[in-house]
Amino acid sequence: MSSVAKKDKRTMSVTALINRAWPLTPAPHQQQSMPSSQPSNFLQPLATPSTTPSVELDIQWLNIEPGFMSPMSPPEMKPDTAMLDGLRDDSTPPPAFKNYPPNHPLSGSKHLCSICGDRASGKHYGVYSCEGCKGFFKRTVRKDLTYACREDRNCIIDKRQRNRCQYCRYQKCLACGMKREAVQEERQRAARGTEDAHPSSSVQELSIERLLEIESLVADPPEEFQFLRVGPESGVPAKYRAPVSSLCQIGNKQIAALVVWARDIPHFGQLELEDQILLIKNSWNELLLFAIAWRSMEYLTDERENVDSRSTAPPQLMCLMPGMTLHRNSALQAGVGQIFDRVLSELSLKMRTLRMDQAEYVALKAIILLNPDVKGLKNKPEVVVLREKMFSCLDEYVRRSRCAEEGRFAALLLRLPALRSISLKCFEHLYFFHLVADTSIASYIHDALRNHAPSIDTSIL
């Protein structure tokens, strides 16, 4: 009984703390005046993985890795899948550069994915494969999807380029021995096992497991907004306009992908359309910055993690999108050094110190999106229920997987006020330099929710 009381007290106190430290995003007219004497040529809100953007970048300002236009695996820490009820395997591809931490369930894995060469999470449909390729093959078979190759049907499929050509990826799955009938048999077994089961409530369907599935399956949208742009009235100096314009185009694509991700969250699409628009409108900047901070953990060197060092240099690289980084010197010259340092020091470094994993990351993303304090919501109680469900899921996951770390649940949530503060500073740059189109972002979100491709049917996974 005492343990239950302790849990409730901790959850409520942290929730109240977050709510008090979570001001609403000010209206654009309140963000116009930012004292600054330095020009800015860098846009922060670039985040979710995407396929090759059709833009040309000014590489003088960016550090481009080989094949940077190809998606890479998510960074670093993965969820302790043994602690997730109903989820036996890791739900996202392994990290791009780092090994698993010693306590990770897959740290001793000796197998690589037969399709892309990433770390395999087990044998799926007859072949050792990662969760990314497993999910791709399962979705292709169950939806009976067909693909076309834009090249010569011999595209390279590795962990950085596996999303570039779906046709060649599927053909390689078959060539490596993945069996279509195994997917169909799995679905039949699942159907038999649920014949006598009671239908779950809407709240029960929202879980970390489902969010992990969405994170690994969400596709790149076919088009992007034209929300961020360098117009004739922009205050960006002429010599910086080309790289800023390129980054704006990439940023627009990332915002479009974010809308697709949000729409696929269980029951988000059942909210009033106006509520969906308001929730995305008030969280997109935070979500994109959070994704940048998450990916940038890979680029933090070991020297900066040495607590005994007294002359530790600040982090030098920020990952804007898979394979594309921005150096601190470029950020300083562009006039956004403060935002650069805050994202890495207040978010990335703290997240790495906490050893935040993928399950915690996706849960926090949903918590950021499902903010019942947004003004104008038509069905606030339903948003409250969904967000409280995510609080409970995260708290339960932390207690099971990190039971020895007292206060971890609070430590995770306390990254959110810092994220909100940084996002407001980023907004100041966007509006001060007139990088936001005159039309409200709500119209772009509305079009994306109404016109983009059908969402992922996770109920059949």
UniProtKB/Swiss-Prot annotation:
Alphabetical list of InterPro entries matching this protein: NHR-like_dom_sf, Nucl_hrmn_rcpt_lig-bd, Nuclear_hormone_rcpt_NR2, Nuclear_hrmn_rcpt, Retinoid-X_rcpt/HNF4, Znf_hrmn_rcpt, Znf_NHR/GATA
Region Hinge, annotated ranges: 185-192
Residue stretches of biased makeup (Polar residues): 41-51
Disulfide bonds, paired cysteine numbers: none
CDD domains: NR_DBD_RXR
Main location: nucleus
Record-level Gene Ontology MF annotations: nuclear steroid receptor activity; sequence-specific DNA binding; zinc ion binding
Listed GO CC annotations: nucleus
Highest taxon in the source lineage: Eukaryota
Zinc finger NR C4-type: from-to: 113-133, 149-173
Record keywords, A-Z: DNA-binding, Metal-binding, Nucleus, Receptor, Transcription, Transcription regulation, Zinc, Zinc-finger
Bias (Low complexity): 27-40
Domain NR LBD: 203-452
Subunit description: Heterodimer of USP and ECR. Only the heterodimer is capable of high-affinity binding to ecdysone.
Annotated family: Belongs to the nuclear hormone receptor family. NR2 subfamily.
Free-text domain note: Composed of three domains: a modulating N-terminal domain, a DNA-binding domain and a C-terminal ligand-binding domain.
UniProt function note: Receptor for ecdysone. May be an important modulator of insect metamorphosis.
Name this polypeptide is given: Protein ultraspiracle homolog
Originating species: Manduca sexta (Tobacco hawkmoth)
Lineage summary: Eukaryota, Metazoa, Ecdysozoa, Arthropoda, Hexapoda
